[in-house]
């Protein structure tokens, strides 16, 4: 029901072609990578696209498909920037229905939810915040044995800077 609800949100905003594209991406990723996930291994994927090309919308579709297929918890990483983290959190709240949506200060909400609804936690890539949430996950009995689906919405911040590397 999560993917269907998300696609309806997109289509209701008048963007039927985007909804169709998201559906196709989510189905492809779901069938090729999520359906046979062992829940014991680590899988890494990459969604490529130009700046402002709709990658976040496609990523939301993949999250919804994964929730439909039984994944209970998602961490959505943003750049270590308060404004970007808040913008992403607000977009998740506006676009994705039926999830327990948490910001970095919502550990109580996450714990109270106990994965009754799939949870999406939107976090900055900040060591202090990530350690805090690692402790939250480790201390809750309900996360034990459950997969955590981690999505990096700002992979440009995932690599080391090449500003001073001598490249032209």
Tell me what each language-model feature is.
Residues 1-168:
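RecA-like P-loop NTPase motor core of helicase/translocase proteins
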